[in-house]
């Protein structure tokens, strides 16, 4: 610990039970110390930052008022849960966040009983919370379920589906809307806090319930008008609550999420209520309590290691452009020649490179929010009118729009262009964000063109290829992070559809790569050459349509054929095996194996370590070749020593 973050009261807290023994004035001090500890920890590890600082008081209040983990506390997405982890027995490991063997950057059921539901993706908390609340009622228990969801996450359709269901069931669910963007622009202050306490209190709820019961015995027209008048009066005084009231929630707020004098009595009132569901609208500030993060919330949403005194982040020197920037720049160049090109993102403009496109073509850029399903069908609609939509979405988030890809795009052969970022393993964000499955879930669909960029130069050409494909949907996948530092083309040149390329020619072993594992395949070929095994290295470029001619030639001309991909079982390697089987090539002498990600959800680590563990680095490729040949790589190497 540094002088900056001495935490005498926090040092006495091992579990929330310790927190609940303190006086209210001490709770305020705990919150201050918790903020200092969060700042200090993230300065060491990096990670999501601004959102966690914004919920320090809320986190402290929730654990003080509710009996966690008996009361279930669910954090939507989970990236704001670092303060929660510190208060729930994980402080001693908080400086292992997002490192191999360390704490997850999100909530995780296997990590603590205080994480009743794991997360990573958005907008799941209310559905999960409702399930827990109903389970509690069915079991005859009376514990509270609290779902904390941000104003960005609550915009997704799944959240509204859950609220609609919860309101109709009158379940004892508590939803806390963490509004840190002021998107609803509510009044915040003493009067709002007073009214929130009033409306969360027993007297108001009892009167309201009595009114509902009386309304059941009134003529329908009068009852409807009375209910409408009550909703309008609440909307006039409180602002922002009418929608949630229509969904069947008791709306409480807006409340200053940094004022414990306001938060604690409201949470206590709601805790002691006999009815539900409740929605408490809490207004917070991202980066609260740390000047640089308050001044630039976007830059401090997620950080690398940084200097606490200055806020300067220790970013490594770049040796090559990032794939997302190459995509964005390539799309701009193509759009300068074609006014039908438009860019679409689902709340990730900077993460996908669409922000680069937006600066050049703001009117042709569409950020639809956390709404991947809508993004895909919106793109499909644009395609029907002759536009060329590029839908840039992370591989892991594209999973959320699978039915739209099938039903709205592929069946109709609409030329939507998918730019699939974060393909393969993503390191510190772990299993919830890994792009492991798109090869498999897209490869089984008719009418798709599927490409993977082996390096940043290939990505430029593949963007140009997508522009030229106007009779069916297409997808190009590429990983997180920097490219290889290869020479970049001035302009993209459309590739021949369904044709791969041979990088180097050999005659004993063939390594057929799909994606950026090509670099490791080349390293493996160098090693195999020193061991006397002449090795061909090929870049498939396309998974669909597959270069059948290339695949058959590699199988005929080599004793061993390995496919290598940054994807799960059922992807590129499976397509190659299917092709070989159909041509009778697996009946002969070729020894074929598919190197894929292991059939597990891999925990977070740095990408190099993860790919080594997955058996997809050069060393593992060499070992696999010798395993197939029935030899030991270490023995063969020692013979040459």
UniProtKB/Swiss-Prot annotation:
Belongs to the transketolase family. DXPS subfamily. Its cofactor is Mg(2+); thiamine diphosphate. Its EC number is 2.2.1.7. Thiamine diphosphate binds at residues 79, 120-122, 152-153, 180, 290, 372. Mg(2+) binds at residues 151, 180. GO terms for biological process: 1-deoxy-D-xylulose 5-phosphate biosynthetic process; glyceraldehyde-3-phosphate metabolic process; terpenoid biosynthetic process; thiamine biosynthetic process. It is an enzyme of class 2 (transferase). This is 1-deoxy-D-xylulose-5-phosphate synthase. SMART domains: Transket_pyr. Pathway: Metabolic intermediate biosynthesis; 1-deoxy-D-xylulose 5-phosphate biosynthesis; 1-deoxy-D-xylulose 5-phosphate from D-glyceraldehyde 3-phosphate and pyruvate: step 1/1. One of its GO terms (molecular function) is 1-deoxy-D-xylulose-5-phosphate synthase activity. Binds 1 Mg(2+) ion per subunit. Gene3D superfamilies: 3.40.50.920, 3.40.50.970. It catalyses: D-glyceraldehyde 3-phosphate + pyruvate + H(+) = 1-deoxy-D-xylulose 5-phosphate + CO2.
